[in-house]
UniProtKB/Swiss-Prot annotation:
Protein's name in the database: Protein FAM83D-A
GO cellular component: cytoplasm; cytosol; mitotic spindle pole
PANTHER family given in the database record: PROTEIN FAM83A-RELATED (PTHR16181:SF29)
Family named by the database record: Belongs to the FAM83 family.
Gene: fam83d-a
Renumbered residue ranges of the record's region Disordered: 424-471
Organism of origin: Xenopus laevis
Composition skew (Low complexity), residue ranges: 425-471
Keyword Amino-acid biosynthesis: no
Length: 562
């Protein structure tokens, strides 16, 4: 009979112990991590280049690892060894233990290991959804919480959703359902801030337990510890249903981000039951120092004075500035650049309104004063009057017209239309103020009829043509830059609107008069035909034609000689 040593010799090499899975440990990656922690990303890239290895970490991962790395204090291991009562740190644990995790202190559903929990069913939810409910993941989680009767167990990386927390707090306070919450250590401060804002103190809740959870720990030879994060997300309700997926209990995941959730029931829930108890045994309670710091910071934020901008009533100047910005060709320019110029425009607008009122008084009384150019047309009954007015133009010998601005003021009345043209000429002289007065040919012609309110006058580059009782401004050239303003004054805008309105009214009135005259002629036509008189048509005399120039534009009217 062969002995034990001979039996061992017959066994092939490596057959007694299982082979390690491939790629479970990589010495090159460990050395690269040492370089990253000690020298930063550049040192790690240099090491990978020397070893001719591809990079296995992205830029966000490098930043996350450096943010989680912390140097261990001296004597930390000795203190932890002496503080351990059961010497669990030096106790050997086999791969599979027959000892169950500890029972949770608030109670747990009475399911033994391997007990039947029903047929496994899966409900899949995607968010955003295109069905009846858009936010299906959030609604599914809230429905599970409302249906809880025995226990609510939650493992989450980030928990800041107010609606879901209110549902959990209501189940804890009103229905007395035990609640266990395990959160990532780096995100628990945000959860505590949310609780304080909602007026909930978790340390005084008798049916709620909140604990901290971390990922795996990685130690380097230089004494640096890298702590991983929690990425597990599942909600266990009554030990029979569980919701899991990439959906986090935050407002952004509930409204903005796309996510999915699986609602599982049946025998598969046993795996999540065991996993939660393992994680709860590995978790740590929240320290009193962290609670006090969160509370003090929230109180400081509440005491800060909230200075709201005083609401100001819109004034006339602010409204005018807004209109000035709208009319400007470059509205994005700062208003201060046009502040002084805008104030001058407002004063000039008031002065112009006063001058216009005085001019209207002069028109009524029949008096008219012209400063530079005088063109006045008066309608006379039964005849046309054409009047030419010499226009004086002042020019300098040394320099010609430097800047010229022409403004036209128009007044429309029932019997008279007055055109006022003002020309402002600036001149530059080198040695002497030598000027000459040169008469210019007739530049304004007024055409009148027996009952019309039209006038036509033109001066320089301003041409005004009036047909019927309407006036239309053709063109107004502003040469030079001395009087050029980039903003259109508000007063001119209202003047233009009034002129356009009067133009439309006069057009309608002239058309109505034309239609009345046509209808009156039609009434005379049957009488002529009934009398069997051959009508003789001839040109209407110019003296008794209708006063509206619109009839001349439409065509010459004929009528039977009576």
């Amino acid at each position: 009979m062969a002995n034990a040593s001979q039996c061992l010799d017959d066994v092939p090499m490596g057959g007694r112990w299982p082979a390690a899975p491939p790629d479970q440990y990589n010495e090159a990656h460990r050395l690269a991590m040492e370089e990253l922690v000690s020298g930063g990303p550049e040192a790690m890239r240099g090491f990978l280049k020397r070893e001719r290895l591809p990079s296995f970490l992205s830029e966000p991962e490098m930043g996350e690892i450096l943010g989680c790395a912390s140097v261990l204090p001296c004597g930390d291991e000795e203190n932890s060894m002496s503080a351990s009562v059961d010497c669990s740190s030096v106790t050997y644990f086999p791969d599979r233990s027959d000892v169950e995790p500890p029972i949770l202190e608030l109670g747990w559903p009475a399911f033994t290991t391997g007990s039947y929990r029903g047929v496994t069913r899966v409900d899949v939810h995607f968010q955003p959804s295109f069905g009846d409910t858009i936010y299906t993941c959030k609604e599914a989680a809230r429905e599970l919480i409302r249906s809880a009767r025995e226990v609510i167990a939650l493992v989450m990386d980030n928990f800041t959703d107010n609606d879901i927390f209110r549902d959990i707090h209501e189940a804890c306070r009103k229905r007395r359902v035990p609640v266990y919450i395990l959160l990532d250590q780096t995100q628990v401060s945000h959860f505590l801030t949310m609780c304080y804002n909602l007026g909930v103190s978790i340390e005084t809740e008798p049916h709620m337990r909140v604990r901290l959870l971390t990922g795996n720990h990685y130690y380097t030879r230089s004494g640096t510890k890298i702590i991983g994060k929690v990425r597990e997300k599942f909600l266990l309700v009554d030990g029979v249903k569980v919701a899991t997926g990439n959906y986090s209990f935050t407002w952004t995941d509930g409204k903005l981000n796309s996510s999915n959730m699986l609602v599982l029931s049946g025998q598969v829930v046993e795996k999540f039951d065991l996993q939660f108890r393992i994680l709860y045994a590995q978790s740590n309670p929240i320290g009193a120092k962290l609670l006090s710091s969160i509370r003090s910071r929230a109180m400081c934020l509440d005491k800060l004075p909230c200075k709201l901008p005083a609401s100001k009533k819109p004034t006339l100047s602010s409204l005018l500035r807004m209109d000035q910005a709208k009319l400007s060709s470059t509205p994005k320019r700062h208003f201060d650049e046009f502040g002084a110029k805008f104030n001058r425009d407002v004063v000039a607008l008031d002065k112009a309104a006063e001058d216009e009122w005085l001019q209207s008084c002069d028109i009524i009384s029949g008096l008219k004063e012209m400063q530079t150019v005088e063109v006045q047309t008066e309608p006379w009954e039964g005849k046309n009057n054409v009047r030419g007015v010499d226009v004086g133009i002042q020019t300098s010998v040394a320099a010609a017209n430097a800047a010229t601005q022409t403004s036209v003021l128009s007044r429309m009345a029932s019997t008279q239309t007055v055109m006022v043209s003002r020309s402002i000429t600036t001149q530059t002289t080198e040695t002497s103020q030598c000027t000459t007065q040169t008469p210019a040919p007739t530049s304004s012609v007024a055409r009148l009829s027996n009952s019309s309110n039209s006038s036509s006058s033109s001066f320089s580059s301003t041409s005004i043509t009036s047909t019927g009782s309407n006036c239309s401004m053709k063109s107004s050239d502003f040469s030079g830059t001395a009087f050029y303003q980039p903003e259109y004054p508000l007063g001119n805008c209202f003047k233009k609107l009034t002129k356009d309105r009067q133009y439309h009214y006069s057009t309608i009135r002239s058309k109505l008069n034309h239609m009345v005259s046509i209808l009156s002629n039609r009434n005379r036509m049957p009488n002529s035909y009934m009398a069997n008189d051959a009508p003789c048509y001839g040109l209407q005399r110019r003296e008794i034609m209708h006063g509206s120039l619109l009839n001349l534009r439409d065509g010459v009217r004929f009528y039977p000689n009576m």
